[in-house]
Amino acid sequence: MCEVTVVIPNYNGQKYLLPCLRALYESSNVEMHVIVVDNGSEDQSITDAKELFPQVNYILLDRNYGFCRAVNVGIRTADTEYVLLLNNDTEVCVGFVEKLLRRIKRNPLIFSVEAKMLQYGNHELIDSAGTYYNALGWAFARGKDASVRKYNRQCRTFAACAGAAIYRKAVFEEIGYFDEKHFAYLEDIDIGYRARIYGYINLYEPKAQVVHVGSAASGSRYNEFKTRYSVRNNIYLIYKNMPVWQIVLNLPFLMIGFFIKALFFWKKGLGSVYLKSLKDGFAICDAGNKVIYDRSRLKNYLRIQAELWINVARRLS
């Protein structure tokens, strides 16, 4: 019986999709369904993939709707208990799917499990060993640029990087799917935050490893596209998931965090993009879907708040 569906979003990924699929099939000994959701690519990535991997279910969208719409289509199409999201610019290591599947099955409260991501240019360096968010309004990857020999213990994380993580499908029906107003960036923090509010947990599994190119769709680590959506979505994420009392409590930290980021992006030549994106973030809050505050979940909010403060120290250490 198949328990897991792998969903791979694709947009003009001719350089990456074939190696991604090849590594997935060569490194896995578990029965799985694979869905590639294409965001209206203009290259030959899907044509090439269909020729070499006809067993894959290809869903072709008419244009680029963004990461969130693509993975939502894939998740809804899946008929398995678990869904594994995988970026097209990744190459999984041996046993990747099995190790994530084994971990998430251990506890029904586990919503997601993130893999250990290694840098494509140097497999000896970590790309991400857990996804975190803090009271400064900063999302960050734990262990970035550290040796692959570090961060070898399984642990809880704030959220799971959706580029290489397995999810319990039934929970999406309870907390909602990826918010398509995000288009791309911070959507994984948002859904991980929501899961935490509802009392679920997110884990990091170091035994499951994947090589990640990073920024394959946007072109570089810091660019106008990535800055625009990540900054805009951060405002929306805060508004959506934090009740008023939590926003007020974190406001001094958030103001400091936004100011530091403004200086950072100004030095990168993206200062005006950053400021405009802040305004855009406030604009989409009105049309957004704020999580309804439920006092019965106060303990969950307090746990989240404690972690937001702890993660400031984690980020600055």
Stretch-by-stretch model annotation:
Residues 83:
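Short aromatic/hydrophobic "clamp" motif used to bind/position activated sugar donors
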Residues 23, 38-47, 63:
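A conserved acidic beta->alpha catalytic loop
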Residues 125-126, 138-140, 146-167, 184, ...:
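A recurrent flexible, glycine/aromatic-enriched loop bordering the glycosyltransferase active site
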Residues 247-317:
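Non-catalytic, C-terminal membrane-associated alpha-helical segments of glycosyltransferases
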Residues 22-31:
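Short, acidic, metal-binding catalytic loop of nucleotide-sugar glycosyltransferases
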Residues 90-133:
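Conserved donor NDP-sugar-binding/catalytic core segment of glycosyltransferases
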Residues 158-209:
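A short, conserved alpha-helix in the catalytic core of glycosyltransferases
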Residues 61-78, 88, 99:
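Glycine-rich, basic loop-to-helix element that forms the pyrophosphate-binding segment
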